[in-house]
């Protein structure tokens, strides 16, 4: 290789490296926590990450699984995460219980217009309607959005004397199948799949969706820390735009969303 050609090639390579480094240096890091484990709805976030939409928006996004909306709200408030996906009821509860908290998260975009929470029981238990839940033992993780909103469900349907049992998320459906609890709360799409994995057919489950039983609540929203909102609103706008692009793709091509979750 001639010296001039070598120098030209080297210069081009260095320029490309410099451009890449500059892009990496200007990328805004964002730690994002989901409300739950990696499963179907996670595709809405994992797809734009896999497709590079966040990267194209000059964002360095890290997406972690969660263990309930309440936990996500708390972690964004603590500064451990910049943004997250959480049930709006859990966010409102945090604001009500922590009026003087210096970093109360705020919602910037609705993802679920209605809460997907429901009460679920096995048909063989004899539970058919909300009235049958009075005095029964219900189970859900402490941070579960359905559990936290259950007082509204109970008031709307005259349920009294329900007792609660807490457990780790992977044990919720197992305890229902074993008969350790009479009913559970959770997001319908999550619990039905988990019950199916434990040998329970969908037709053998009584599902009482909150929106159909007097609980008119928004569902999950993207939440952000006030610190990030104040210091870098452009990054939040870029995140939401990339997210919306990913959502459109998942809706148009669900198989691509499944691949992103896998």
Question: What do these predicted regions represent?
Answer:
Residues 15-16, 42:
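Extended rod-forming repeat segments used as scaffolds/tethers
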Residues 17-21:
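N-terminal signal peptide c-region/cleavage motif recognized by signal peptidases
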Residues 3-7:
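N-terminal export leaders
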Residues 25-178, 182-189, 208-210, 215-216:
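Short, glycine-/small- and polar/acidic-enriched structural segments
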Residues 1, 13-15:
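Secretory targeting signals
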Residues 88-90, 171-175, 179-262:
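Pocket-lining segment of extracytoplasmic ligand-binding domains
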């Amino acid at each position: 290789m001639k010296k001039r050609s070598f120098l030209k090639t080297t210069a081009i390579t260095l320029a490309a490296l410099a451009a890449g480094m500059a892009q990496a240096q200007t990328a805004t890091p964002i730690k994002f926590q989901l409300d739950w484990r990696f499963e179907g709805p996670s595709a809405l976030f994992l797809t734009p990450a896999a497709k590079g939409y966040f990267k194209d928006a000059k964002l360095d996004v890290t997406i972690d699984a969660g263990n309930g909306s309440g936990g996500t709200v708390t972690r964004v408030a603590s500064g451990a995460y910049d943004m997250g996906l959480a049930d709006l009821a859990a966010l409102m509860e945090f604001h009500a219980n922590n009026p003087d908290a210096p970093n109360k998260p705020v919602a910037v975009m609705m993802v679920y217009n209605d809460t997907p929470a429901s009460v679920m029981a096995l048909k063989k238990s004899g539970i058919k309607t909300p009235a049958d839940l009075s005095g029964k033992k219900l189970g859900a993780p402490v941070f579960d959005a359905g559990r936290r909103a259950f007082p509204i469900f109970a008031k709307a349907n005259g349920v009294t004397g329900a007792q609660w049992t807490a457990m780790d998320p992977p044990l919720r459906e197992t305890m229902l199948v074993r008969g350790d609890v009479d009913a559970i709360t959770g997001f319908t799409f999550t619990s039905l799949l988990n019950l199916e994995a434990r040998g329970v057919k969908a037709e053998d489950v009584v599902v009482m969706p909150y929106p159909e039983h007097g609980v008119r609540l928004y569902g999950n929203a993207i939440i952000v820390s006030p610190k990030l909102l104040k210091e870098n609103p452009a990054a939040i706008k870029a995140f939401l735009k990339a997210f919306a692009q990913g959502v459109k793709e998942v809706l148009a091509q669900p198989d691509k969303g499944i691949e992103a979750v896998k």
